[in-house]
Regions:
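A short acidic, Gly/Pro-enriched loop at the edge of an enzyme's catalytic core
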Residues: 150-160
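Conserved alpha-helix/loop element of class I SAM-dependent methyltransferases that forms part
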Residues: 73-93, 109
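Class I SAM-dependent methyltransferase SAM/SAH-binding core
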Residues: 96-150
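Conserved catalytic/acceptor-binding region of the Class I
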Residues: 186-248, 262-272
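Conserved Class I S-adenosyl-L-methionine
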Residues: 74, 103, 237-317
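N-terminal, positively charged/glycine-rich alpha-helical extensions of SAM-dependent methyltransferases
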Residues: 2-6, 13, 26-65
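A short glycine-rich, Lys/Arg-flanked "PGG" loop and its adjoining helix->strand segment in the class I
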Residues: 173-188
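A short SAM/SAH-binding and catalytic strip from SAM-dependent methyltransferases
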Residues: 158-172
Length: 317
């Protein structure tokens, strides 16, 4: 195991935690957001009982909205791939929506590859700062917390898309089932989500340092696939992708995630001493993501298309 070239002292560790919002946030794993909304009049988000974690997710992405797209190379590449998979789908009548649209990466990738789309997807996201940077979100598009389910305008949807958003929800499996249930017969759900197996270097460092791992727990790929099938989806394409970045020390990794806004954690933040131990034990190994991509169709439409081949890579990840 190789140590980082420089370990911050206690004061620097405290300053770094404050930079990430240590009063509310921990140090967390990957997030991501994606996103002309055909439907414009969403209710304003004003639920005083909204879970605290949901609020921390919004705040993290809001603080980093200006730097998000410059850092989100993986999210851009996955968005392009998912858009390619949706390029030739026979879409039934009904609304389209991008769930967790953020700055609009996924919907823009879809429209670039399917410019004849009848209408652009509605942009749904909790973070107003990201929606303000989304060229597909109209001025009346209000934030929406996907933990509340989907707005009534999305009943009998023809296409629901989501990339790097489901993992931030309180119950990903239940929300996946809810999304599938809102499709029209023959409607499509296209999903990309980071899954368990990601960030193994972070987990290894936490074990070696005997500190809590504050990375976001990610859903199991098999559980998501099973939930989709139980919800009545016929899966046309299912693929588990692995992505990695060159080895970097722990501090650089956490700063990268901070620049994306992925700073919310379900765990209390590490204290400065714990942070120093974590960074000292961080292995010199690639940072790895495991991403599940699937496209499924709700039963009741025309016969499903043959299984789609893997699309060519788009912009580099």
């Amino acid at each position: 195991m190789t140590l980082p070239s420089r370990i911050p002292d206690a004061a620097e560790g405290q300053a770094f935690q404050e930079q990430l919002g240590s009063d509310q946030d921990g140090l967390v794993s990957v997030g991501g957001r994606h996103g002309r909304g055909g439907l414009r009049t969403l209710p304003q988000l004003a639920d005083p009982a909204r879970p605290a974690f949901s609020s921390r997710v919004r705040q993290g992405f809001g603080r980093s909205a200006a730097s998000y797209e410059a850092q989100a190379r993986l999210q851009q590449g996955v968005a392009w791939r998912l858009g390619r998979l949706c390029r030739d789908l026979p879409l039934p009548a009904g609304p389209y929506a991008d769930l967790g649209a953020g700055s609009g990466l996924l919907s823009r990738a879809l429209l670039a590859q399917r410019p004849s789309l009848a209408k652009p997807p509605l942009q749904l996201d909790l973070c107003p700062e990201l929606l303000a940077r989304n060229p597909l979100a109209g001025p009346t598009t209000a934030p929406w917390d996907l933990n509340r389910g989907l707005p009534p305008q999305l009943r009998d949807a023809g296409l629901l898309l989501s990339s790097f958003a489901l993992q931030w929800l309180d119950d990903p499996l239940a929300q996946l089932a809810n999304w599938a249930g809102r499709l029209a017969p023959g409607g499509w759900l296209a999903l990309a989500v980071p899954v368990a197996g990601s960030f193994d270097t972070w987990q290894a460092a936490a074990r070696a340092a005997s500190v809590p791992c504050t990375a976001l727990p990610l859903p199991e790929a098999d559980g998501l696939i099973e939930a989709a099938i139980r919800s009545g989806l016929n899966l046309r394409h299912t693929q588990r992708l692995s992505f990695s970045r060159a080895p970097r020390d722990g501090l650089a990794t956490l700063r990268l995630l901070s620049s994306l806004g992925a700073t919310a954690s379900r765990q209390p933040p590490l204290d400065p001493g714990q942070l120093r131990r974590l960074l000292a034990h961080w292995p010199a190994a690639p940072l790895r993501w495991e991403v599940l991509v699937f496209v499924g169709r709700r039963s009741g439409g025309a016969p499903s298309l043959p299984a789609a081949p893997s699309p060519p890579d788009g912009p580099p990840c």
